[in-house]
C-alpha cells in the first residue's frame, strides 16, 4: 500500500526503560542495529500497527508498555534503488512513518525476539537515548534523528532527562558497536529468567555472543 508519492505508511517505535535508555535490535544475521518498525496494513490505525509490530519484533504486549507520545506528522525517508525490488522500482520511493515513544512497564525478561516464525532481530540491548547512529543503515539516520529530537520533549524531567547535545558534535555517547570506548551495558542473559548481568566491554563485538542473543 503506497501513497501517491510512492511512500509506504509505516510506524516506528522508540522503547524506553526506567532509566530513559532505548531498545536497540540487531537485524537478523546483519551488523546493523535499529528500532522496531513495520508497515501499516490496510484498515489498521497507526496505533494498531504499532502494537502488532511491537509484539512481532519484541514479543511485548500492550500491558507491557505505556504510550508517552507520538510524532505530530509523518516522517519520511527514501530507500536507495539497490535496496528496492526490481518489480517495484519506479513506484516505491521509501517509507513515511509515525513514531511512537513507549515506556516499558514490564520486565526485561518479557522481551522475546522469537515471538513469530519470522524474527527481525537476533540480539538486543538498552542504549543511551542520544547515542551516535553509526550502526544504523545510512538512509535511515536522518529520520531517526528527527524522531528522537521531536519525542525527547516527553522524557521525564528533571532528574532523568536525557539532555540534547549542543555544539557542532551532533551526538556524544559511545558508539553502539564501533570506536573503542569503555562503557557499562545492562543486558539480559537469556539462560536466567528475569535476571540482569552487568558487563564491562569496550565494544559490542567483544561481548560474549550467548549473553546478547535474544530468547
Swiss-Prot record:
Motif (Nudix box): 38-59
Group of enzyme by EC: hydrolase
Keywords attached to this entry: Hydrolase
Domain Nudix hydrolase: 6-149
Statement: the UniProt record of this protein carries the keyword Membrane: no
Recorded coiled-coil stretches: none
Co-factor requirement: a divalent metal cation
Protein family membership: Belongs to the Nudix hydrolase family. RppH subfamily.
Protein name: RNA pyrophosphohydrolase
Species this chain originates from: Burkholderia vietnamiensis (strain G4 / LMG 22486)
